[in-house]
């Protein structure tokens, strides 16, 4: 394989993994533990 391919594949995998983890944190099970600053400061 070429060097560019050997570098691009792991970087792409890391990017996809990070994006998936961010989406899971934002919308999955852990999102219930996140606080909402707008609800804390209702007028």
UniProtKB/Swiss-Prot annotation:
Pfam families: PsbN (PF02468). Its main location: plastid. Keywords: Chloroplast, Membrane, Plastid, Thylakoid, Transmembrane, Transmembrane helix. GO terms for biological process: photosynthesis. It is a single-pass membrane protein. Belongs to the PsbN family. HAMAP family: PSII_PsbN. This is Protein PsbN.
């Amino acid at each position: 394989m070429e060097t560019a391919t050997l570098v691009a594949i792991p970087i792409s995998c890391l990017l996809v993994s990070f994006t998936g983890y961010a989406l899971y944190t934002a919308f999955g099970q852990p999102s219930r533990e996140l606080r909402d600053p707008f609800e804390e400061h209702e007028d």
